[in-house]
Curated annotation (Swiss-Prot):
CDD domains membership: UdpNAET
Gene that this sequence comes from: murA
GO annotations of cellular component type: cytoplasm
Protein's UniProt name: UDP-N-acetylglucosamine 1-carboxyvinyltransferase
Modified residue annotations for 2-(S-cysteinyl)pyruvic acid O-phosphothioketal: 116
Main location: cytoplasm
A GO BP annotation: UDP-N-acetylgalactosamine biosynthetic process
Keyword Coiled coil: no
Species annotation: Aliivibrio fischeri (strain MJ11)
EC identifiers of the protein: 2.5.1.7
Keywords recorded for this protein, A-Z: Cell cycle, Cell division, Cell shape, Cell wall biogenesis/degradation, Cytoplasm, Peptidoglycan synthesis, Pyruvate, Transferase
Length: 422
C-alpha cells in the first residue's frame, strides 16, 4: 500500500504543467472501440489505473490491445461477451462495455460495477435506454445481462434525468441500431462530444453532441480510425486551484479554455488573473488576495461536481466565507472532515458546506475517500505547515497521471512511499 508524504511549504506552486488526456473521455472511447470491426488508434490516453483495467478487460474479451505512445485496439477477434467481477469491481465505467457488446454481437453481460464511494450512481438509466433500443435486460447473480434478437432498433428516447454515463451508453449502442435514434435531455459534457467525435471517426453518424438533443443515424458496421482524446478539464482545474491557493503562477499546456469556462469564471471571481490561448491557460495569483466564492454544482456547462472538492479547499483558504452547494451526488463532502483535521474551517448542512477564513493548515495524517477529494487533500498538504501523509492514494491514481511528478515540477515536496517505509 502506497501513500503520499508531503512536506508543506509557504512557497508558491509555480511553473508549467502539461495536461493529460481526459480520463472521462478516454474510458468510454476505449469501450466504444468494441464497436469497430477494424483496428483503431487512440492517442493522448492518460496513464491511469482505470485505463489499465479497461485495456485488460478488452483483452479478456478477445481484443488485441497494445500501447506504444497511442493505444492500439483490434476488436475484430472479440469472442467473449462477459465483463467479469474480478476486473470491474473497482471501476464503475465498466458498464460502458454493455452497449457496444449488445449492439455489435447481440449479447453482453457486465458485473454490477464499483468505483468511488460518493453516493448512488445506479445503472437504471443505462438499462432503460438499452431496453428502449430493443434489448432484453436481466439482472442475475450480480450481472447485468443484455440480449437482442437481430439488431437494436432506433428509438425516440427522453432521458428521465441528465446522465453522462447513460448518454454515452445509449449513444454508442445506437450507432449500430437499425434506423435513427433521437436522444433528448442528453448530457452535454465535453467528454460526450469527444466520444461522439471518435464514433464518427470510425464511421458512425452522430450529430447534435454538446446539445441536449443527440441524433444517431444507425449504420450496419463500423470500421477503424484514429482519434486524439480531448484534454482533461478536471486535471486542468485542479492545477489552476493549486496555484491559486498557494499564491503561485502557472501555465497549463495542452488544454482548452472552452472546456472549463465555469471554473475559469470562478477563479477570476476569486481574485486570480486568468489568461488563455489556443492550447494553454495561465493563472497568476502573485500578490493577489484570494476571495471566497459561492459554488453550485450542476451538469455541464455549469460548474462541474468534479471540481467541488478543490474549490472547497480554495474557499477554506480565502478571505471571507463561501457556500458550496452539491446538487449532483450525495455524500460528496467526505473530504471536509479530513481537511478539518488539518485545521480547516467548515460547516456542513445537508448538501451545503460553508467554508472560509482558515488561519493556515497544519500537516496531518489524512485519508483519501474518492478521486477528487484526494486531490484536494494533496494540494492541502502542499500548502500546510509540516508533514502530511495521504493514505489510500489508489483513489488519486484512478484519475491523475503522475500527479506527484507534476506537483514536484511546480515546487512541491511530495513523494510516493510504501507504508512499510513510514
Amino acid at each position: 500500500m502506497y501513500k503520499f508524504r508531503i512536506q508543506g511549504s509557504d512557497k508558491p506552486l509555480s511553473g508549467e504543467v502539461t495536461i493529460s488526456g481526459a480520463k472521462n473521455a478516454a474510458l468510454p472511447i476505449l469501450f466504444a472501440s468494441l464497436l469497430a470491426e477494424e483496428p483503431v488508434e487512440v492517442a493522448n490516453v492518460p496513464k491511469l489505473r482505470d485505463v489499465d483495467t479497461t485495456m485488460e478487460l478488452l483483452k479478456r474479451l478477445g481484443a488485441e490491445v497494445s500501447r506504444n505512445g497511442s493505444v492500439h485496439i483490434d476488436a475484430s477477434g472479440v469472442n467473449d461477451f462477459c465483463a467479469p467481477y474480478d476486473l470491474v469491481k473497482t471501476m464503475r465505467a465498466s458498464i460502458w462495455a454493455l452497449g457496444p457488446l449488445v449492439a455489435r454481437f447481440g449479447k453482453g453481460q457486465v458485473s454490477l460495477p464499483g468505483g468511488c464511494a460518493i453516493g448512488a450512481r445506479p445503472v437504471d438509466l443505462h438499462i432503460h435506454g438499452l431496453e428502449q433500443l430493443g434489448a432484453t435486460i436481466k439482472l442475475e447473480e450480480g450481472y447485468v445481462k443484455a440480449e437482442v434478437d437481430g439488431r437494436l432498433k432506433g428509438a425516440h428516447i427522453v432521458m428521465d434525468k441528465v446522465s453522462v454515463g447513460a448518454t454515452i451508453t445509449v449513444m454508442c449502442a445506437a450507432t449500430l441500431a437499425e434506423g435513427t435514434t433521437v436522444l433528448e435531455n442528453a448530457a452535454r459534457e465535453p467528454e460526450i462530444v469527444d466520444t461522439a467525435n471518435f464514433l464518427n471517426a470510425i464511421g458512425a453518424k452522430v450529430s447534435g453532441m454538446g446539445t441536449d438533443t443527440i441524433t444517431i443515424e444507425g449504420v450496419e458496421r463500423l470500421g477503424g480510425g484514429y482519434h486524439e482524446v480531448v484534454a482533461d478539464r478536471i486535471e486542468t482545474g485542479t492545477f489552476l486551484v493549486a496555484a491559486a491557493v498557494s499564491g503561485g503562477k502557472i501555465v497549463c499546456k495542452n488544454t482548452k479554455a472552452h472546456l472549463l469556462e465555469a471554473v475559469l469564471a470562478k477563479l477570476e471571481e476569486a481574485g486570480a488573473d486568468v489568461q488563455t490561448g489556443d492550447d494553454w491557460i495561465s493563472l497568476d495569483m502573485t500578490g493577489r488576495e484570494l476571495k471566497a466564492v459561492n459554488i453550485r454544482t450542476a451538469p455541464h456547462p455549469a460548474f462541474p461536481t468534479d471540481m467541488q472538492a478543490q474549490f472547497t479547499l480554495l474557499n477554506m483558504m480565502a478571505k471571507g466565507s463561501g457556500i458550496i452547494t452539491e446538487t449532483i451526488f450525495e455524500n460528496r463532502f467526505m473530504h471536509i472532515p479530513e481537511l478539518q483535521r488539518m485545521g480547516a474551517h467548515a460547516e456542513i448542512e445537508g448538501n451545503t458546506a460553508i467554508c472560509g477564513d482558515t488561519d493556515g493548515l497544519s500537516g496531518a495524517q489524512v485519508m483519501a475517500t474518492d478521486l477528487r477529494a484526494s486531490a484536494s487533500l494533496v494540494i492541502a498538504g502542499c500548502i500546510a505547515k509540516g508533514e502530511t501523509i495521504v493514505d489510500r492514494i489508489y483513489h488519486i491514481d484512478r484519475g491523475y497521471d503522475k500527479i506527484e511528478d507534476k506537483l514536484t515540477a511546480l515546487g512541491a515536496n511530495i513523494e510516493r512511499v510504501h507504508s512499510d517505509d513510514l
